[in-house]
Amino acid sequence: MKIIEKILSENLSIDNDTFIFDIETTGLNPRFCKIILIGILYNCQDKTIIKQFFAENENDEKELLTNFIEEIYHFKNHITFNGLAFDIGFINYRLKKHNIDFNLNKEDDFDIFKFVKLFKQSLNLKSCSLTSVEKYFGIYREDIINGEKSIKLYENFVKTQDKNIMDIILLHNYEDVYNLSKLINIKDLVKEKLDLLYISNENYNLSIFPVNYKINAKKLTMNYFIFSGEHNNISIYNDNYSIICEDDNISLEININKGIDRENNTILFYSLSKIIPLKFNDQVLEKNIYSLCNFLKKNELHNI
């Protein structure tokens, strides 16, 4: 097993109790596949360090994991890209497989992929892949391979021990963790691209953005992400709707009505000073949905 360490010439803005990590594996299923490379980035004594743990063959996995744990056990938090769905679960399974008494906690993770996915449509992103997100925010990389290509290259490396192949795999992983460090402030980066809604009174000042909604025959639910401001977990209950503020989310639930017009069209609507149609047969009237939700939310929260 090889450990490759590099001290960056720049000191990146990352909390001392937090590290970034990314893994490379021989496949997607941790039951049958192994971890062959873990890259981490962290700050130590005013220096930013990238360290990579590389398995020269698949039998090095346990040693790789042991060295990884020894390096990161004292950190409180971690940052990943799709780590909640892949990296964390994969590592934990392989740790258990090798009887290593350690577990990465998903609650300690900030998953940049999960956050960006909330705003995929609003940002007009075709894909939420790391390379797509990087390009969107003007971050470019040297490496030209993806995870699938990395698997095939590693198979060749194990057979040949060709250093050039190893360097290609290492560069791919290196740029994954390094570029994630450029996305640590992803909330601010996304915030600059959106037309936020602002709600303020003498008690608080919130900046929010609608991320998704659901509508059925009885209820319309709209969720907002809170970019800034404190709200003390506000809860508002009305005969026709409720507003729940919890952590960085505002959930608005509205009771709606269903009717049929003279031409047998099915209409979902809400009655305010006038009837506001929200869905006409299969056509969702998004403009009306957003206007209604924003009006109710802003009106209620502003008056608290």
Give each language-model segment a name.
Residues I38-I40:
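Short beta-strand scaffold segments in enzyme catalytic cores
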Residues M1-F21, T26-C33, N43-I304:
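DEDD superfamily 3′-5′ metal-dependent exonuclease/proofreading module
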